Curated annotation (Swiss-Prot):
It comes from Mus musculus. The keyword Ion transport does not apply. It is found in: Cell membrane; Golgi apparatus membrane; Cell junction, Focal adhesion; Cell projection, Podosome. Residues 7-16 have a biased composition (Low complexity). Transmembrane segments: none annotated. GO terms for cellular component: cell projection; focal adhesion; Golgi membrane; plasma membrane; podosome. Its cofactor is Mg(2+). This is Rho-related GTP-binding protein RhoU. GTP binds at residues 59-66, 106-110, 164-167. Residues 32-48 have a biased composition (Gly residues). Tyrosine phosphorylated by SRC in response to PTK2B/PYK2 activation. Ubiquitinated. 'Lys-48'-linked ubiquitination at Lys-180 and Lys-251 by the ECS(RAB40A) complex leading to its degradation. InterPro entries: P-loop_NTPase, Small_GTP-bd, Small_GTPase, Small_GTPase_Rho. Belongs to the small GTPase superfamily. Rho family. Interacts with PAK1. Interacts with PAK3. Interacts with ARHGAP30 in a GTP-independent manner. In its GTP-loaded conformation, interacts with ARHGAP31. Interacts with PTK2B/PYK2. Interacts with PAK4; interaction protects RHOU from ubiquitination and subsequent degradation.
Length: 261
C-alpha cells in the first residue's frame, strides 16, 4: 500500500495553512547515531535477525502519523496528503550492539476504521499516541477516545504521547485560522499534564518536516518497547520461584516461632 503523503489537513474546524516547503532528501547515513545505545539504518519493509519491537501509531486522522514514519524511514517528506488505511514499515537499528527490527504500524484514525484498527494491536510493544499541537480537537480525543481504546485492547502496553507538527506552533497563518475559531495551539504544559494523567511513558513534541525531536520519539519507542517486552517475561520466572520462596519464608517463621515458644 502506498504511504500517506503530504502535510495533513488540520482536523480542527479551521482551514489548513498553505503547504510548507519540502526539505531536500537526505542521505540515509547522514544523521549520525540514533541516541545512546541506539544506532543503525532505516528502511521500508525488509527484516532483520534478532529481536523485534512492534510500535503502533494511533491518533486522529490527518495529525501527521504517516509523515512521521516516512520522514524517519526515508529522511524525506511527503508532498501530497493521501489518507492512510493501514500500512507497515520497518527500521533496523542496533541497540547495545545487537540488531533490533522496529516494526512500525501506521493506522487510520477515522471513525470508519474503529472496528478494523484493533486488529493491528496484537502483540504491540509500544504505542505512539499522536495529536497535532495545532489541533485542540485531536488533543481532546487523546483522553476521550484513544487512551480508552488502547487500554481496552492492550491494558499493559506502554504509551508515548507525541505532539506532532510542532513547526506550526508559531506559523502566522495557522494562528490566524485558529483565532477565527477562538482556539489556540495546545500548551506544552497541558500536554505534559495529560501524559501524566494517562500514565504515558513520556511526552515528546516533534516535527516530521524539520525532523526536530524525530529521532527522540523513535529512540524512546525502541527503549520502552524493549523494556515492556522484557517485563512480560519476568512474571513467568517469578511464578516458578514463588513456591520455593513461600516454603523458605514458612521455615523461617516456624523457627522464630519455636524460639519464642
Amino acid at each position: 500500500m502506498a504511504p500517506q503523503q503530504g502535510r495533513p489537513a488540520l482536523p480542527a474546524r479551521c482551514e489548513p495553512p498553505a503547504a510548507p516547503p519540502v526539505p531536500p532528501r537526505r542521505e540515509r547515513g547522514g544523521r549520525g547515531a540514533r541516541g545512546p545505545g541506539v544506532s543503525g539504518g532505516r528502511g521500508r519493509a525488509g527484516g532483520a535477525e534478532g529481536r523485534g519491537v512492534k510500535c503502533v501509531l494511533v491518533g486522529d486522522g490527518a495529525v501527521g502519523k504517516t509523515s512521521l514514519v516516512v520522514s524517519y524511514t526515508t529522511n524525506g517528506y511527503p508532498t501530497e496528503y493521501i489518507p492512510t488505511a493501514f500500512d507497515n514499515f520497518s527500521a533496523v537499528v542496533s541497540v547495545d550492539g545487537r540488531p533490533v527490527r522496529l516494526q512500525l504500524c501506521d493506522t487510520a484514525g477515522q471513525d470508519e476504521f474503529d472496528k478494523l484498527r484493533p486488529l493491528c494491536y496484537t502483540n504491540t510493544d509500544i504505542f505512539l499516541l499522536c495529536f497535532s499541537v495545532v489541533s485542540p480537537t485531536s488533543f481532546q480525543n487523546v483522553g476521550e477516545k484513544w487512551v480508552p481504546e488502547i487500554r481496552r485492547h492492550c491494558p499493559k502496553a506502554p504509551i508515548i504521547l507525541v505532539g506532532t507538527q510542532s513547526d506550526l506552533r508559531e506559523d502566522v497563518k495557522v494562528l490566524i485560522e485558529l483565532d477565527k475559531c477562538k482556539e489556540k495551539p495546545v500548551p506544552e504544559e497541558a500536554a505534559k499534564l495529560c501524559a501524566e494523567e494517562v500514565k504515558a511513558v513520556s511526552y515528546i513534541e516533534c516535527s516530521a518536516l524539520t525532523q526536530k525531536n524525530l529521532k527522540e520519539v523513535f529512540d524512546a519507542a525502541i527503549v520502552a518497547g524493549i523494556q515492556h517486552s522484557d517485563s512480560q517475561l519476568q512474571p513467568k520466572k517469578s511464578k516458578s520461584r514463588t513456591p520455593d520462596k513461600v516454603r523458605d519464608l514458612s521455615k523461617s517463621w516456624w523457627r522464630k516461632y519455636c524460639c519464642l515458644a
